[in-house]
């Protein structure tokens, strides 16, 4: 099984959304984890709410520190914020590192309706990246058989 770690700074919104999307779209083909370089200690309520709109429940996910994963092996390490890309440590073994620069929706100013739209845009953006990667993985697997 392909092991993937998604990193952002707080592990409260973007990487949590990505973890939930990988679980939903990967349908058991990937082992997905997320972490933060400076974990917030919670999953953002608007991330939970907007993912539920898509039928994906991330309410039981936990905000985790990158340190928990430091000596583990992954096939892919994906950073979804520029700070995490700069702070991303080296992991053991061979892996592919991807960077999907994604603005933090939790910093979007304005009324809640506009904040919700920012979270929805984040979900759409990450979903596009994730579906593309999953398709590439599927094609690689088919080509190797």
What are these language model-derived features?
Residues 85-145:
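Phosphate-binding/catalytic loops
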Residues 17, 26, 30, 58, ...:
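Generic alpha-helical hydrophobic packing signal
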Residues 71-73:
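Alpha-helix C-terminal capping/helix-to-coil transition sites in glycosyltransferase folds
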Residues 1-68:
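Conserved active-site segments centered on acidic
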Residues 55-61, 83-92:
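Short, Lys/Arg-enriched charge-dense amphipathic segments
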Residues 10-12, 82-85:
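Short glycine-rich anion-binding loops that position phosphate/pyrophosphate groups of nucleotides
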Residues 36, 81, 101-103:
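Residues at the C-termini of beta-strands that transition into short coil/loop
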């Amino acid at each position: 099984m392909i092991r993937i770690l998604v990193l952002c700074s707080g592990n409260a919104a973007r990487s949590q959304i990505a973890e939930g999307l990988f679980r939903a779209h990967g349908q058991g083909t990937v082992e997905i984890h997320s972490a933060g370089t400076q974990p917030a200690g919670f999953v953002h309520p608007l991330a939970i709410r907007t993912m539920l709109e898509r039928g994906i429940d991330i309410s039981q996910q936990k905000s985790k520190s990158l340190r928990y994963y430091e000596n583990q092996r992954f096939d892919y390490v994906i950073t979804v914020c520029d700070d995490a890309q700069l702070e991303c440590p080296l992991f053991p073994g061979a892996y592919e590192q991807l960077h999907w620069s994604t603005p933090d929706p939790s910093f979007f100013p304005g009324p809640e309706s506009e904040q919700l739209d920012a979270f929805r845009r984040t979900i759409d953006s990450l979903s596009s990246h994730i579906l593309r990667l999953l398709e590439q993985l599927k094609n690689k697997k088919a080509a190797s058989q």
